[in-house]
Amino acid sequence: MPLVIRLLERNICILLFLFLLLGNLLIEYAAYRKMPIVGGLFRRMFFKTLRRKEVIRNEFIPSGSVYILAAALICTVCFTQAAAAAALTVMLISDSCAALFGKFFGTFRFSNGKSLEGTAAFFISAFGILSVLAWNCPLSAVLLTAALATGAEFWESRLKIDDNFSIPLVTGFMLNLFYF
């Protein structure tokens, strides 16, 4: 996704992300309504990747992919190409690092269920990514952006905003403000 933003023209990215977002929403809604063909296919293909709240639900709750595509669309519209690509890179890599480190190495848990190790992995990877992709940006701005992105991930349940949506928006805003 970040590569698409960097390589394709902005308007093409906007149309592509809009098409994918609407298609994803329609397919997920069909799965929620248990529509025979689309719903069954969706459940067979993605059941193992969905979180518990996305599988067992009394109301339509979009999966993380909807939030990722919505964030990609908004970042592409609102931020520079470089900021949008960097923001999505932070979300894709750092959120994965946090989940993996938290799951396999997490020993100290906070009250929100997040682990110290996962949170540290998010911050370190976000700082590393931003140090490379925003190498001209002042170190203090990179640290602040990584810290705010980590906060968006850490406080996901309290903010009631999916971190796949909040991380790229916070990161992209800060990068546009400080650097791009």
Where are these regions (language model features)?
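Interhelical loop and helix-boundary elements at the membrane-water interface
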Residues: 1-19, 26-132, 143-180
